[in-house]
């Protein structure tokens, strides 16, 4: 059992989770453990690690920078490390609150997309002195064991990758 299962183990828990992380009412979610989502996911549904909502600022429907970055690199959320969602979510929040108009191209100017075998894709700064976000925790070990299968109108009408590869 994952660390975050207690947040969504009841109908009331799911409702509270949806309110707290601003998931619209037309979107459904269901919990699954690591390695279990391959059997439970239906066509058109997307699997998103719970930690990306809790620590990474993931929002449904995906906001512009996050959605465009994942589409440009043809990545599904299960292929991405948490730091990617933190950076992309941070840019989406800056755009929303300050109207900066940042895009996924701005991410490419500062970060390089790398793949760590067994861990997924992550963003690494081209230059250590220049970053969009500081103060990442040293490790998220053990926090990526819980997943949500997001169904119904999670994509806001735009095509998004739902499978790896």
Label every PLM stretch briefly.
Residues 1-165:
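Residue-register detector that marks a fixed positional context within folded domains
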């Amino acid at each position: 059992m994952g660390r975050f299962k207690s947040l969504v183990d009841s109908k009331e828990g799911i409702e509270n989770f949806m309110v707290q992380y601003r998931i619209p009412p037309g979107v459904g979610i269901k919990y699954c453990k690591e390695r279990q989502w391959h059997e439970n996911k239906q066509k058109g549904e997307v699997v998103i690690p719970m930690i990306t909502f809790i620590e990474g600022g993931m929002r449904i429907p995906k906001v512009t920078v996050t959605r465009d970055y994942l589409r440009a690199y043809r990545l599904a959320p299960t292929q991405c490390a948490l730091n990617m969602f933190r950076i992309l979510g941070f840019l989406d929040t800056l755009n929303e609150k300050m109207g900066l108009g940042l895009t996924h191209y701005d991410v490419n100017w500062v970060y390089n997309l790398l793949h760590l075998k067994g861990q997924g894709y992550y963003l690494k700064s081209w230059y250590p002195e220049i970053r969009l976000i500081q103060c990442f925790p040293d490790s998220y070990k053990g926090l990526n064991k819980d997943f949500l299968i997001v169904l119904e109108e999670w994509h806001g009408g735009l095509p998004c990758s739902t499978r790896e590869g």
